[in-house]
Regions:
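Primarily marks secretory-pathway-exposed extracellular/lumenal segments that are disulfide-
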Residues: 1-9, 623-655
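Extracellular polysaccharide-degrading/modifying enzymes targeting complex plant/algal/animal polysaccharides
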Residues: 10-331, 335, 586-593, 598-624
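Surface-exposed loop/turn motifs in large extracellular/passenger domains
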Residues: 52, 277-285, 302-305, 330-345, ...
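Consensus "Asn ladder" position of solenoid repeat domains
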Residues: 289, 309, 342, 347, ...
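Short, hydrophobic beta-strand segments
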Residues: 723-731
């Protein structure tokens, strides 16, 4: 039995100015004023009542927000201490949309959505947009360039021109486009046709006789290393987990794993790019939150920050809405526009289709921004229509810092490009540039090199350049005054590229596989370059003034170098850099005491270092469990042991025990802030023994604010049993009192 009692306290409660605004999705109401005892139910409701410098404290739960923060300086939004708060950008197709899936004749299931969606999740794992050649997220094959089809153009054959691409008939893991039988017209081609740049274009024509597709010309075009894949057409659905959304009819098509009924699955669709848009507000902070399939954008802010936050699937392209050739200024990514002194710290960004973070604006509009002690993984599996040189972390401004971070598994050709005079220190980066040709891990164009400081990084296991001072060849290169020191690079294709002049590269260690390029490339081309640079105290197996030729043919300029250990000059069949380090296989890169490296003072570490520096994040990243919503009560019929947030929809089986009756009386004591409960059980006999529970709920019927348990043991000859309890609530009501009774399982 249940009975409610009400209180008007929360409707009339006032929040003193300067105190936090509390939010509780389970027990709050946006009709209340946001005190600790009378919280709001949404963050948006709290923001509507907020003033500058307010703090919004959010209790555990799942929140679907779409809010603009305008002219609220100093606002902080954070999770309550110890609570898990997830900002969710998806809607459940079954629960939120109440939509029903149907089966098409070819076995593909479909559902009509009430609003647009462009990213599909099964059990909170992203499903693959239908594509050819096939690839998947589960095995990371989306980051394998062999899962792209190839074009036939080379520097010498002039096979086709911009706006056309001839398929090579099949290579790698798949056959050719003609063999597939697919009609590509109307699909979207993701085209890597400009080395470090890729574009999405609608396929407008298909000539099967010469296996050539046509599309609108791309902005940049190179005559080598062409690769592509197709998306955006129902015909491409051929493996389990693939989907396509028809934006004209709002119909979603999906090939369900193992021929299951999609109506029985936890399927969610992304419906918003941003949960929070911050405009005209300085010092806005988001702290200790999780974002799932949504993110944040800032415009015109100073001192805004994201701290102690995990973002999963924050960035997406618009191709899921069948939009190709996206404007790079309007990509749906975590972005700061015209912002300075911003901070991202102790945060994680995972699984994006697009860049991880973008800062837009020139030197006067975007400067002194910092990304520190943060983790980036599985960033950008399509690498199309992104800004700059198409990078993982982008900033177009000046004096920005990227420090103590960890990055691995990225698609874009360049990883870090953060504007003029960058500081890139204490990072560990590997497995980068997987889906484009050319590129570098730390990329500095000619005008960005002045006062750059690149130091104390580990960069390894990549086919891209490690640290590159880029620009035109020869005397036209005016890149100047970058400093690169105390870095360790291994298994890198051209670890350090020094191009320009007046640069300083010292105390770097480079070892192992050079992947066809010199470890340190100090370019002198067309009679110009690096006449005044200083290259000192480095340890590398190959240092020369050419990308791949040796020291004898391309020595460094006289007077620019000294105290280096250069394998071209000093090495032998038995001696290389790694042979003189303490334990490089276990990442101890200190030189062995009394080794030649030690005597020269060459390399990134000193032999006497007792606490050698280690780059990367200072904490251990553990991916959160999926933010599953369900019944949390283990006594309920629909208890979900995997759920972490309450759905408020537990189901209980009603058991009638003969002529058993009960009466519940719950009254507010007029002279005190407590409630008295009297429960009478009638027709109880001594032949049966029962257990009971009395509990109170406020908003969420699954959340027990207080409970009592006991046994009913009537005396022989009696058939009534009475329970009296008293409780003082910690929060104002209204409350509902519940009583459950069941047979003693031990009897």
């Amino acid at each position: 039995g249940t009975r409610s009692y009400s209180s008007n306290s929360c409707e009339s409660a006032n929040r003193p100015q300067g105190t936090p605004i509390y939010v509780d999705a389970v027990n709050g109401s946006d009709l209340w004023n946001g005190t600790l005892l009378c919280p709001k139910s949404t963050i948006g409701g709290a923001i509507q009542n907020a003033s500058s410098h307010d703090e919004i404290i959010v209790s555990a739960g799942l929140y679907h927000e779409n809010v603009t923060i305008d002219n609220l300086d100093g606002l902080t939004i954070r999770a309550a201490t110890g609570d898990r708060v997830v900002i969710d950008g998806t809607k459940s197709i079954a629960d939120d949309f109440n939509a029903t899936w149907h089966m098409a004749s070819d076995g593909i299931q479909y559902v009509d959505l009430p609003q647009h969606g462009w990213q599909l999740f099964l059990n909170h794992s992203e499903q693959i947009p239908a594509r050819w050649p096939n690839a998947n997220f589960e095995d990371d094959s989306v980051f394998n360039r062999s899962r792209w089809a190839q074009g036939t153009l080379t520097n010498s054959n002039n096979a086709y021109t911009n706006g056309w691409l001839t398929d090579d008939g099949g290579s790698g893991t798949q056959g050719g486009l003609l063999t597939s039988g697919i009609d590509p017209v109307g699909s979207i081609a993701i085209l890597n046709v400009a080395s470090f740049r890729s574009y999405s274009r609608v396929v407008t024509s298909w000539n099967a006789s010469n296996e050539t597709i046509g599309f609108d010309a791309t902005d940049l075009w190179k005559t080598k290393h062409h690769a592509y894949f197709l998306e955006g057409k129902r015909e491409l659905i051929d493996i389990e987990g693939e989907w396509w959304y028809n934006d004209s009819t709002q119909r979603l098509h999906y090939k369900v794993p193992a021929n299951q009924n999609a109506n029985n699955l936890d399927l969610r669709i992304k419906t918003q790019p941003y949960a929070f848009s911050v405009i005209n507000s300085d010092d806005v902070a988001f702290e200790n939150l999780e974002f799932f399939a949504t993110t944040v954008q800032f415009d015109d802010c100073i001192g805004c920050s994201i701290e102690d936050t995990v973002m999963r699937y924050p960035s997406t392209s618009k191709r899921g809405l069948n939009i190709a050739g996206e404007d790079v200024e309007e990509r749906w990514v975590t972005r700061f526009d015209h912002c300075s002194e911003s901070l991202i710290e102790n945060s994680a960004f995972l699984r994006t289709d697009g860049t991880a973070v973008e800062f837009h604006g020139a030197a006067l509009q975007s400067h002194n921004n910092t990304i520190n002690d943060s983790y980036f993984s599985h960033i950008d599996w399509s690498v199309s229509d992104t800004p700059g040189l198409m990078v993982t972390i982008y900033d177009g401004g000046k004096d920005n810092s990227f420090t103590n971070n960890t990055i691995h598994r990225t698609g874009a050709s360049a990883t870090i490009s953060i504007g003029d005079a960058p500081t890139v220190m204490h990072n560990e980066i590997w497995d980068t540039g997987l889906l484009q040709s050319d590129g570098a891990v730390v990329q500095m164009m000619m005008n960005e090199q002045q006062d750059a400081n690149i130091a104390y990084n580990w960069i390894h296991d990549t086919d891209k350049y490690g640290i590159r001072m880029d620009g035109p060849a020869g005397g036209t290169n005016e890149g100047r005054n970058a400093t690169v020191h105390h870095n360790v690079l291994w298994n890198v294709s051209g670890a350090i590229m020094v191009k320009g002049d007046y640069h300083h590269a010292h105390n770097n260690t480079v070892l192992w596989d050079d992947r066809g390029k010199n470890h340190m490339i100090v370019l002198h081309e067309n009679g110009a370059g690096n006449e005044n640079s200083t290259i000192w105290n480095n340890a590398a197996d190959s240092i020369a003034a050419h990308r791949s030729d040796n020291w004898d043919s391309y020595p460094l300029q006289e007077g620019t170098f000294g105290f280096n250990w250069n394998g071209y000059q000093n090495g032998s069949a038995h001696t290389n850099v790694s042979s003189m380090l303490v334990d490089p296989n276990n990442r101890d890169f200190r030189p062995q005491t009394y080794s030649v490296l030690d005597d020269l003072g060459a390399g990134a570490y000193d032999s006497q270092d007792t606490n050698p520096w280690i780059p990367g994040i200072t904490w251990i990243f553990v991916e959160p469990s999926n933010p599953r919503v369900g019944c949390l009560d283990s006594f309920a019929d629909n208890y979900d042991p995997l759920a972490v947030f309450s759905s408020g929809e537990c189901i209980y089986t009603l058991v009638v025990l003969g002529e058993f009756e009960l009466n519940v009386e719950a009254d507010i004591e007029p002279d005190g802030n407590h409630v008295e409960i009297e429960i009478e059980f009638f027709n109880v006999t001594a032949q049966d023994e029962f257990e009971y529970e009395i509990w109170f709920t406020r908003v969420d019927p699954n959340y027990k604010h207080h409970n009592y348990t006991g046994e009913i043991t009537p005396e022989y000859g009696e058939n009534t049993y009475t329970v009296n309890e008293e409780w003082t609530p910690m929060q104002d009501g209204p409350y509902t009192v519940h009583c459950a009774v069941w047979l003693d399982q031990n009897e």
